[in-house]
Amino acid sequence: MSDEIVLYRSVASRSVTALWLLEELGVPYRLETRDLKKGETRDPAYLKINPFGKVPTLAIGDQVTFENPAICLLLADRYSYGALAPKLEDPARGPYMTWTVWATSALEPASALEGHDIPPKRPGDWHFGFGKLTPELDALEAALASGGGYLAGGRFTAADVMVGSVVALRLFTGQIPRRPTLAEYVDRLSARSAFKHAADINWPPAEFAHVQPAP
């Protein structure tokens, strides 16, 4: 079985997270681009790979993984165990896994709904399990303050790739407020050469020409 790494991605999408981590790892990989505008993630051949019709999807030989947190956890464990992925016995392992999953289970939905007035189906029936944006960001800032600017073990890990990519995009679109701590976090991460390369590939400026960056 070949262990070739293939990343199925789309331009101007959240595929940048997995691509950034691959660049951090320095492992060889091949990109397979699917055009979202042309519906190429919904064609039958791609749906056999990812039944949700989404990107990114990672294939390592016959092993297929989708959803950014799962991809990040797998890649870091497989290619950077003990470095970008804290070891199982490392106290940082818990925060590392928590923040990696939190990025899409809490931060993404909370920030996507911020500012939208969605009425409950019944009076008193208002509840979202992922929480409200302000306390989520408060917790993130507290973790960064206590962790020396990073989320696990006081050092850069794949958790920062996962969370940092979400924060970077949400700051750009204005879906989260530009708090100084978060802006500094993104500035620090975006200075990394792996981030720059991934962003150049997956977030080309022309694709965002219609988006007015948040002040």
Report each predicted region and the residues it spans.
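GST-like domain detector, emphasizing the conserved glutathione-binding G-site
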Residues: 1-127
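Residue-level signal for nonpolar/aromatic packing positions in well-ordered secondary structure
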Residues: 22, 58, 71, 140, ...
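Short, solvent-exposed turn/loop segments enriched in Gly/Ser/Thr/Pro and often Arg
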Residues: 35, 158, 202-205
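Active-site-flanking alpha-helical
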Residues: 76, 166-167, 199
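Short, flexible loop/turn segments with low-complexity composition
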Residues: 87-88, 197-205
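GST-like fold's C-terminal all-alpha helical module
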Residues: 100-191
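Acidic/histidine-enriched, glycine/proline-rich intrinsically disordered or flexible terminal extensions
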Residues: 202-215
